Amino acid sequence: MITAEMVKELRERTGAGMMDCKRALVETNGDIEKAIDELRTKGLAKAAKKAGRVASEGVVTSYIHGGGRIGVLVEVNCETDFVAKTNDFKQLAYDIAMQIAASNPEYLNREEVPQEVINREKEILKAQALEEGKPEKVIEKMVEGRVEKFFKERCLLEQAFIKDLDKSVQELINENIARMGENITIRRFARYEVGEGIEKESCDFASEVMSQLK
């Protein structure tokens, strides 16, 4: 059975259209890796074809919000200096910086999350499920689902893009890879907030960033 999650994963990894991804999954009986090969053969896996190419050019972009209360630096890479200087690429980098300011990700992707952090989250989530009186047989699936939610909230590439919540940041990047014709990656980022780590009256700066987009 081909699920919406499978189609979404294939889209994120290839940048191909939704119907093309669905057809490829049907033709390969739901095998993601074979579906990628199928799309590449047909010339549709634009992002997958470019993912292995070296992206050593790019920009370091900053975003400062609220009179200097939140600051972000992010390095976004592409293959050539020509693309790095385009307005489209600069706008992409700026949008990613705003995303980081608003959504406060802790990691770039799920591969960066330490195993001990994942294990701790699982223990907490399992304890919560037991506290809710859930049957043992459904707890494992519940924990799996909540760990996925954890990744989508804490990992930049899996977060919903603040300007279009129907797509992830990874899908945004894949769209730009397809349009610009070069591999694009986020190498690293840093986010600073005034008074971070100091006990103070709560102030939701992230919501302020989000409100600017409305």
Swiss-Prot record:
Subcellular location: Cytoplasm
Taxonomy, superkingdom: Bacteria
Gene Ontology cellular component list: cytoplasm
Coiled coil: none
Stretches the record annotates as Involved in Mg(2+) ion dislocation from EF-Tu: 80-83
Pfam families for the chain: EF_TS
Record keywords: Cytoplasm, Elongation factor, Protein biosynthesis
Predominant place of localization: cytoplasm
GO molecular function terms attached to this record: translation elongation factor activity
Function (record text): Associates with the EF-Tu.GDP complex and induces the exchange of GDP to GTP. It remains bound to the aminoacyl-tRNA.EF-Tu.GTP complex up to the GTP hydrolysis stage on the ribosome.
Database matches in HAMAP family: EF_Ts
Homology family: Belongs to the EF-Ts family.
NCBIfam families: tsf (TIGR00116)
PANTHER family referenced in this protein's UniProt entry, alphabetically: ELONGATION FACTOR TS, ELONGATION FACTOR TS, MITOCHONDRIAL
Protein name, as recorded: Elongation factor Ts
Organism: Syntrophomonas wolfei subsp. wolfei (strain DSM 2245B / Goettingen)
